[in-house]
Amino acid sequence: KYYEPNTVQGRSVIVHLFEWRWKDVADECEQFLSPKGY
């Protein structure tokens, strides 16, 4: 259980991108997560 996940108030999502290449993390954040409000 995550007791202090350091999320924005009212949100509880944590994205697990461990072992991804930095370019792939950037692409995922810019092209998928950010447009969906994460």
Swiss-Prot record:
Recorded catalytic reaction(s): these are: Endohydrolysis of (1->4)-alpha-D-glucosidic linkages in polysaccharides containing three or more (1->4)-alpha-linked D-glucose units
Q: Which domain of life is it from?
A: Eukaryota
The entry's note on the tissues where this protein occurs is: Expressed by the venom gland.
Molecular function GO terms recorded: alpha-amylase activity; metal ion binding
Q: Where in the cell is it found?
A: Secreted
Free-text comment on the cofactor: Binds 1 Ca(2+) ion per subunit. Binds 1 Cl(-) ion per subunit.
Instruction: Cite a GO CC annotation.
Output: extracellular region
Q: Which cofactor does it need?
A: Ca(2+); chloride
The answer to whether UniProt assigns keyword Hydrolase to this entry is yes
Query: Which Gene3D superfamilies does this chain map to?
Result: Glycosidases (3.20.20.80)
Keywords annotated in UniProt: Calcium, Carbohydrate metabolism, Chloride, Disulfide bond, Glycosidase, Hydrolase, Metal-binding, Secreted
Which family would the database say this protein is a member of?
Answer: Belongs to the glycosyl hydrolase 13 family.
Instruction: Specify the protein name.
Output: Alpha-amylase
User: What high-level taxonomic lineage is stated for the organism?
Assistant: Eukaryota, Metazoa, Ecdysozoa, Arthropoda, Chelicerata
